[in-house]
Amino acid sequence: MKRPTRRDFLRSAAAGSLAVPAMLRAHELEGQAQPAPGDRIRIALIGAGGQGSSDTRSALRVPGVELRAVADIYDGRLARAKEVWGSQVVTTRDYREVLARSDVQAVIIGTPDHWHARIATEAMAAGKDVYVEKPMVQKIDEGHGVVAAAAQHTRILQVGSQRVSSIVYAKARELFRSGAIGELNMVEAWINRNSAIGAWQYTIPPDASPQTVDWDRFLGHAPKRPFEPTRLFRWRNYRDYGTGIPGDLFVHLFSGIHYVLDAIGPTRVMATGGLRFWNDGRDVPDVMLGLYDYPKTASHPAFTMSLRVNFADGSGESQGFRFIGDSGVLTIGGPGVTLSRKPRPKEPGYSIDTFPLALQQQILEEYRTKYPPQNSVSSTSDEVYSPPSGYSDQYDHFVTFVNAVRSRTPVIEDATFGFRAAAPALLTNDSYFERAAITWDPEGMRRIRT
């Protein structure tokens, strides 16, 4: 039986309803004929933490992908790599040994954020294609260097915000471009969590020590300090190594928004929030709200956006994403993407109770003449488009990456796209800590200081 393709979904989802959701179709390459030996893609993983390992599992599901090497600064993760992927996998603490290998064509970078730009740049200079986790850079001033390196070395670089390869977001993009919601005026998104793991309280292995961890290599260009395993295994909590809520979560939302709308970024960034619950030594907020103004472009009208994250939400885990227009709303989440349209009344209505009675009667007569009663019924049903059970946009994202490595065709989420998604996230941090609104040039990708 022929497996449905991504294109099949986009065709079959041309119409849907709340009662009978249209089924989105994904890449389903598993089980097809294996690529010829010359088409095999040999990869290495640099940074074998939770995200890097998850990325590698998805990459290895793509036919023809083989794992050759793993680099990490904690010996326990190197041992685990051999347990999971076999004793033939070469392991090392030094990522430069991976970059020097001639049998590695592409690398996955799953390190803490403060290493992303440096390793990505060195990898491309070494002739490797790069899949780098989001955010692409930790600091604004690193962005142009990564963009330039990708162009100079003609390498494929794809950032790991998988929504850009999602069939759900592809459908939202199609609906937006068709005019389904009228003129966009606002976007809002939120992520709520209420668990220790959700707040980055990851487990610290009891054998972590200066003997099992290359502490100096972890620190890199960050300030020097004595060994402290909490800073390694919970690095997202610290500005020296991570990018807080915006770099971990907002950047996914920016990537999705920019893909759906063909947007390149806001011109104004404002943020507020605070450390409200997780007083564990972290130096970043656990509650954050960002506000953004996007200018009118050829692809979309001017709109305002709000993003919020709460790591101590007593209602539990939830998230939502809404594109709001004057004729409808696209909601991403739950079953997939939902198009809701509640038509605005054609009649303007009236508010006349405080007028003299004679004047009320006059206004009513004129109103009823101009707007006679309508006997028609308007539709307010939702259209729901759902992905198949078990769908993985992370897998689709690696299909996109591997296909690009093989064919040398560009990807959507390249270095420029990645920088334009990372920048407003990083500027959210700047706005919060500087307590000021920030102006950004999304075309030139530069902060404007006034």
Predicted regions and their residues:
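N-terminal Rossmann-like dinucleotide-binding module
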Residues: G16-W85, R163-S166, I257
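Glycine-centered tight turns that cap/initiate beta-strands
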Residues: G64, D103, A180-E183, G265
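Short, solvent-exposed loop/turn and secondary-structure capping segments
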Residues: S54-S58, R80-E83, R118-E122, E142-G143, ...
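Beta-strand-loop-alpha-helix segment that lines the small-molecule cofactor/substrate pocket
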Residues: P112-D113, A117-S165, G179, R435
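Contiguous beta-strand/loop segments that form the cofactor/metal-binding neighborhood of enzyme cores
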Residues: K171, E183, E188-W190, A196-T416, ...
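N-terminal Rossmann-like NAD(P) cofactor-binding module of classical short-chain dehydrogenase/reductase
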Residues: V107-I108
